[in-house]
């Protein structure tokens, strides 16, 4: 009952209520793998929402009006070094680890953890996670796409281009727009 309601709360972006119900579901059943996965997803969404809200609040709109738009940069954005933010990321990573312990062949946990690691600029970890997702499901186009972007970010155009090409072959249309 808690899990289903948590899904409903997540769909309407009531993240705190979703987390409350997921915590209850996990307390009811410590081995509820899907609840751990969804809790990690909800926490990651909550972090994303919090960062975007803080980013918007930190923009000096007078400065934006006075500058040419191509010269504008979001220099006042919250840093990933924030201690409470680091703790939030750690909680998400712990939930993903719990899912991997109980369901090591669940590809989306590697994919999502790769996305999280990429947002933390842990590119080596992100590549490892995308690679594992691809190993488990060789036709996972989105994992090829994201891994290709990370390779490009690191300056490895050969591997990046190969992954983006493969992603395109697998139906990820965005891979052709880079």
Predicted regions mapped to residue ranges:
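Alpha-helical tetratricopeptide repeat
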Residues: 1-178
């Amino acid at each position: 009952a808690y899990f289903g309601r948590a899904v409903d709360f997540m769909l309407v972006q009531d993240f705190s209520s979703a987390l409350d119900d997921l915590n209850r579901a996990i307390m009811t059943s410590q081995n509820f793998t899907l609840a751990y996965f969804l809790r990690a997803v909800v926490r990651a969404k909550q972090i994303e929402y919090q960062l975007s809200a803080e980013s918007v609040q930190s923009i000096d709109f007078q400065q934006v009006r006075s500058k040419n738009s191509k010269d504008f940069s979001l220099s006042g954005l919250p840093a990933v070094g924030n201690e409470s933010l680091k703790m939030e990321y750690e909680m998400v990573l712990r939930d993903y680890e719990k899912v991997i312990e109980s369901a090591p062949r669940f590809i989306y946990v590697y994919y999502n953890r790769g996305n999280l690691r990429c947002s933390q600029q842990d590119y080596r970890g992100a590549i490892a996670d995308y690679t594992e997702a691809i190993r488990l499901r060789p036709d996972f186009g989105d994992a090829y796409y994201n891994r290709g972007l990370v390779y490009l970010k690191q300056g490895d155009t050969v591997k990046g281009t190969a992954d983006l090409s493969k992603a395109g072959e697998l139906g990820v249309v965005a891979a052709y727009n880079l």
